[in-house]
Amino acid sequence: MAVGKNKRLSKGKKGLKKKTQDPFARKDWYGIKAPAPFNIRDVGKTLVNRSSGMKNANDALKGRIFEVSLADLQKDEDHAFRKIKLRVDEVQGKNCLTNFHGLDFTSDKLRSLVRKWQSLIEANVTVKTTDDYLLRLFAIAFTKRRPNQIKKTTYAASSQIRAIRRKMTEIIQREASTCTLQQLTNKLIPEVIGREIEKATQGIYPLQNVHIRKVKLLKQPKFDLGGLLALHGESTTDEQGQKVEREFKERVLEEV
């Protein structure tokens, strides 16, 4: 009888699973901090792989963009239809310091604004802020009935639409190009520009639902750590106190 390897006995058991490792064991949680214009500064948490070898966790976090509802940032449900984009520019400890990266409307809000019997007017302007951020702002507006109007429709003439669009462009250009990104964010939150357009176009055709529906960041200047820390209420300066010199007084020991 030939002595050989019994293939049946040497085979391993079928269906043996490899030892699974928890993927979250190699990850860390980092806090997301919103900049100064917003009321709620702690946005949430984000996961990232721990630093190992040549891979640094901070490099993986920088440049991440988070979309947050403005209602959560301002603690006001009236802003629920607007979404703010925040970009991670710096990581300090376990905190991601973010800056404003853009604004957008929810699709359901945009769809609810479009109705019959009215004209829709849109305009977009590319502007540069005083701190060299290149932005594109998209505005939207709708015509409304004049006081005591009997006619059902509120369609504006082509010449009126052109005049309104020209006015919208002028106001956006003026309001955005004369301020910093932080000041512009402060204007966007309470919709100052939209109200300004509505007021300025009353003589041409009355408008309603005037909004800056989208803000797109096209180009940003060279990264400034001091400016970012100022947005987050921190400072790069050394805040140690100065040494105060006092006159030396010799202590006289009393004789016992």
Swiss-Prot record:
Signal peptide: none annotated. The modification N-acetylalanine is found at A2. Keywords: Acetylation, Cytoplasm, Ribonucleoprotein, Ribosomal protein. GO terms for cellular component: cytosolic small ribosomal subunit. It holds the Pfam family Ribosomal_S3Ae. The keyword Coiled coil does not apply. Residues 1-18 have a biased composition (Basic residues). It comes from the Eukaryota. The keyword Zinc-finger does not apply. GO terms for biological process: translation. Residues 1-22 are annotated as: Disordered. It is found in: Cytoplasm. GO terms for molecular function: structural constituent of ribosome. PROSITE patterns: RIBOSOMAL_S3AE. Belongs to the eukaryotic ribosomal protein eS1 family. Component of the small ribosomal subunit. Mature ribosomes consist of a small (40S) and a large (60S) subunit. The 40S subunit contains about 33 different proteins and 1 molecule of RNA (18S). The 60S subunit contains about 49 different proteins and 3 molecules of RNA (25S, 5.8S and 5S). HAMAP family: Ribosomal_eS1_euk. This is Small ribosomal subunit protein eS1.
